[in-house]
Amino acid sequence: ALPVLCFYLEEEKMPFDRFAVTALLTVCLILGTGKTVMSFLTVDKNETKRPVAEFLAGNGYDFGFATYNNANIITELTNGEVEIGNIGDPEHLEYFKWSSPMKYYEEGYHAGETFLLLTAEERAEYAEAPALKQGEKVYEDGIYTVYLFDSTEELMNCAVARQ
């Protein structure tokens, strides 16, 4: 849209029209930027994620899996102390490798306990998934639930094959 506007302003002969369009565009950009800045200053979009991130880091749970919307954010909130790979869903446990380090998905990358982090909605939707039945529930706050497994292999063995 901006390149088209530049062509319009270049061809427009009436100075008032050029001024009016430029002023209108400037006002729109300033209002949009102001709204975005105010949103960042007044709303903590990660407020609900902080308690579970602190729990994971504070208890030494340093590797696990979660769905895409939570994985990278928790890693960022813990300054990399907690590494989380992406999965598509808790039933099939297929790796969703978008926007995360490939090392998380390499066999043998992590030795030791592995967790599965789910939202309350995911937990309810996949209540019958083997991973939820076989993992040890170590955290629940009404928003997030964490299940613990002895190893990544144990977690991945809970995957249900797609039909």
What are these regions (language model features)?
Residues 54, 73, 103-107:
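Short, flexible, glycine/charge-rich loop motifs used to bind or transfer phosphoryl groups or to couple energy/partner
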Residues 9-18, 46-51, 55-58, 79:
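Short, structured coil/loop segments at alpha-helix boundaries
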Residues 16-18, 40, 131-132:
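N-terminal secretory signal sequences
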Residues 28-72:
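Membrane-embedded, lumen/periplasm-facing catalytic core of multi-pass transferases
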Residues 6-36:
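Signature aromatic-anchored transmembrane alpha helix within multi-pass, membrane-resident enzymes
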Residues 59-94:
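Short periplasmic/luminal acceptor-recognition loop of GT-C membrane glycosyltransferases, typified by
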Residues 1-3:
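Membrane-embedded alpha-helical segments of integral membrane proteins
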Residues 81-162:
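Luminal/periplasmic acceptor-recognition loop/helix of membrane-associated glycosyltransferases
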